[in-house]
Design a protein with these regions (language model features):
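Conserved alpha/beta-domain cores
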Residues: 2-64
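Charged (often Lys/Glu-rich) extended helix/loop segments that serve as interaction or gating elements
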Residues: 30, 55-160
């Protein structure tokens, strides 16, 4: 989905998450800048939003945002765009219907995609992303649990 035309589902993202035409910002931290610092895949963990609150801060729960780089994107005979990313989605309860393309604004129509991991042979996840997504692009996916992954750069907001 292009960032310009779709609103974030606030219950799926950490509290205080906003977006621009080419970025997702979690608690004032640009995910695009985070990737510049940490590389991909990387995870930002912050306070979760309280379900049904419209994005208000949870006092007890955490949520993660996974940033991954597109390794390849190809149209398949099943009429879907198969997008391979450099991250593993299994185990993090990804909200793939909220996946966002960041790093550059896209005006391409949303296309049905299958997000696949370049690390395992696990089955893909159905999502919608811009039809012009290509190798090198960034995808950001909210996850409903904290991601305790090995080999992934983690950044966590710490409460004062």
């Amino acid at each position: 989905m292009t960032l310009r035309t779709t609103a974030l589902a606030t219950d799926s993202w950490p509290a205080f998450t906003t977006h621009s035409a080419d970025d997702v910002i979690v608690a004032a931290l640009s995910i695009s800048r985070l990737v510049d610092w940490c590389g991909t895949p990387c995870v930002h963990t912050a306070d979760a939003a309280t379900p049904g609150s419209g994005g208000r801060l949870s006092e007890t729960e955490l949520a993660s945002v996974l940033a991954a780089r597109v390794v390849s994107a190809r149209w398949s005979g099943d009429l879907r765009l198969h997008v391979v990313i450099d991250a593993e989605l299994d185990g993090c309860r990804p909200v793939v219907e909220e996946a966002r393309h960041v790093g550059r604004a896209s005006t391409a129509a949303a296309a049905a995609v299958v997000l696949e991991s370049g690390r395992t042979r696990a089955a893909g996840y159905a999502a919608f992303l811009p039809g012009d997504i290509a190798a090198g692009d960034l995808v950001v996916i909210p996850c409903l649990v904290v991601i305790p992954c090995l080999g992934v750069t983690l950044l966590h907001d710490v409460k004062p």
